Swiss-Prot record:
The record marks 65-66 as: Reactive bond for factor Xa. One of its GO terms (cellular component) is extracellular region. Belongs to the protease inhibitor I3 (leguminous Kunitz-type inhibitor) family. SUPFAM superfamilies: STI-like. It comes from Bauhinia variegata (Purple orchid tree). This is Trypsin inhibitor BvTI.
Amino acid sequence: DTLLDTDGEVVRNNGGPYYIIPAFRGNGGGLTLTRVGSETCPRTVVQASSEHSDGLPVVISALPRSLFISTSWRVTIQFVEATCIPKPSFWHIPQDSELEGAVKVGASDERFPLEFRIERVSEDTYKLMHCSSTSDSCRDLGISIDEEGNRRLVVRDENPLLVRFKKANQDSEK
């Protein structure tokens, strides 16, 4: 299965960029970054509180040299407009996170951390998954609201966040 964007076009491997937006409006916007706890830079992946925000654009990359992304492949995800964070700023789940299973950005221990997979749920709806580095098992990512009201992207065994991929056009209003 090939990953498609909201226009029905192929999501390009190491291309785009794309916004990751919720499949259903009403509970927040696209995925973005915020500062949590003692972070000096925004390093925590969250869902924007406003459903009118598409969040920050990402590039999705897979190791096979292909123009497209297959839903069976492990991928890296990185924000392209993340400020004050060392590049490359891959999504990853650090072992020492204050919230278990919370998705963060920053330099990873691995040069190209293939920690995530995107699985089709319906025709143009997908779910994000975090995959173990030691096995083939992957677990859903969903939203958990922390004590500060942040809608954090975390590993969840139920209620995965259902998403779509929207081209980040330079002339876009949002």
